[in-house]
Structure formats: structure tokens, C-alpha cells
From Swiss-Prot:
The gene is rplF. Part of the 50S ribosomal subunit. It comes from Streptococcus equi subsp. zooepidemicus (strain MGCS10565). InterPro entries: Ribosomal_uL6-like, Ribosomal_uL6-like_a/b-dom_sf, Ribosomal_uL6_a/b-dom, Ribosomal_uL6_bac-type, Ribosomal_uL6_CS. GO terms for cellular component: cytosolic large ribosomal subunit. The keyword RNA-binding applies. One of its GO terms (biological process) is cytoplasmic translation. This is Large ribosomal subunit protein uL6. PROSITE patterns: RIBOSOMAL_L6_1. The lineage of its organism: Bacteria, Bacillati, Bacillota, Bacilli, Lactobacillales. GO terms for molecular function: rRNA binding; structural constituent of ribosome.
Length: 178
């Protein structure tokens, strides 16, 4: 992990970073993110570059170093470009539609599933079988997309369900009769 931690984070134009005793606020064109980091990792901002320095080479510090760097980089990318996860639905009668900020899913149950958009997350439904989840916080985008997928994850015999775009679902062979 320490090799990741040693990489320099390039700060794009229009992104401002405020470090107040390891509580880092990143402001950009898409929004603002704030997060508290480990006090042992020193965060230095010089011009358009950000570096992280760890106090020693213990295994714990190396892992925290790499994780902190990855989280900071995700914050910078999130406020400048944003994150997007796309899902697709396969199955007869499987549909998605937007009702305000709610996502209403018909996925073969006796009732419809409603997913409320968390703060900072927007849903887009291009057609009834494709959903995109967008936001500036990579963790929340991923968790929301994973929750939507978990409502009807792809089954292994016909592949029906909600999956990520490009996800490969290995299909099993059915029972062979006598």
C-alpha cells in the first residue's frame, strides 16, 4: 500500500483544498466534500500538488498511508468530475422509472421497490431497463448502486435481474431430465 501513498495527487484547476488539523475539505465545481483523516499522516498542499508523509514504516502506517491517499484522490476526482455507476435490468417486465427523486423498480415481485436517493446522489433512467447512479462521493455512489443491484441480483440459470453494465454473469446448466 505504501507505493500508492507515495504518489502525488495532482489538484486540477478550480479545486480548492483546505486542511484544518487533518480535517480536509475539498471544494470544486461539482460540490464540496469534508472528511477527517488519521492524525499521524501529514498532508501537505503545495501549489497544485498534494503529498502525504507517514511518520514511520510500520505495517499499520503503510496501510493507512495508502488508504488516506486513495480517499483524498477520490475526493478530488469526485468534486471535479464526479462518479457514475450504470446498471441494466434483464428480465420480462423488469422496469425502472423515476418519481421525483425516488427510483421505482418493478422486478418481478408482488410489489414495487422504491429507492430514495441519498443526499448528493442523482438517478437517471435513460430507458426502462437502464439506471445510472451519479454523485461526487465514490463510496455513496457504489453503496447505492450495490443496494439497487441487491434488490434482484442476477440469478445463475437465466441471468435475470439487475446487474452492472459490462458485468459477466456465468450461467449454470439446468437439470438434465431422464
Amino acid at each position: 500500500m505504501s507505493r500508492i501513498g507515495n504518489k502525488v495527487i495532482i489538484i486540477p484547476a478550480g479545486v480548492e483544498i483546505i486542511n484544518n488539523d487533518n480535517v480536509v475539505t475539498v471544494k470544486g465545481p461539482k460540490g464540496e466534500l469534508t472528511r477527517e483523516f488519521n492524525k499521524n499522516i501529514e498532508i501537505k498542499v503545495e501549489g497544485n500538488e498534494m503529498t502525504l508523509v507517514r511518520p514511520d514504516d510500520s505495517k499499520e502506517m503503510k496501510t493507512i498511508h495508502g488508504t488516506t491517499r486513495a480517499n483524498l484522490n477520490n475526493m478530488v476526482v469526485g468534486v471535479s468530475e464526479g462518479f457514475k455507476k450504470e446498471l441494466e435490468m434483464k428480465g420480462v417486465g423488469y422496469r425502472a422509472q423515476l418519481q421525483g427523486s425516488k427510483l421505482v423498480l418493478s422486478v418481478g415481485k408482488s410489489h414495487q421497490d422504491e429507492v430514495e436517493a441519498p443526499e448528493g446522489i442523482t438517478f437517471t433512467v435513460a430507458n426502462p431497463t437502464s439506471i445510472s447512479v451519479e454523485g461526487i462521493n465514490k463510496e455513496v455512489v457504489g453503496q447505492t448502486a450495490a443496494y439497487i443491484r441487491s434488490l434482484r441480483s442476477p440469478e445463475p440459470y437465466k441471468g435475470k435481474g439487475i446487474r452492472y453494465v459490462g458485468e459477466y454473469v456465468r450461467l449454470k446448466e439446468g437439470k438434465t431430465g431422464k
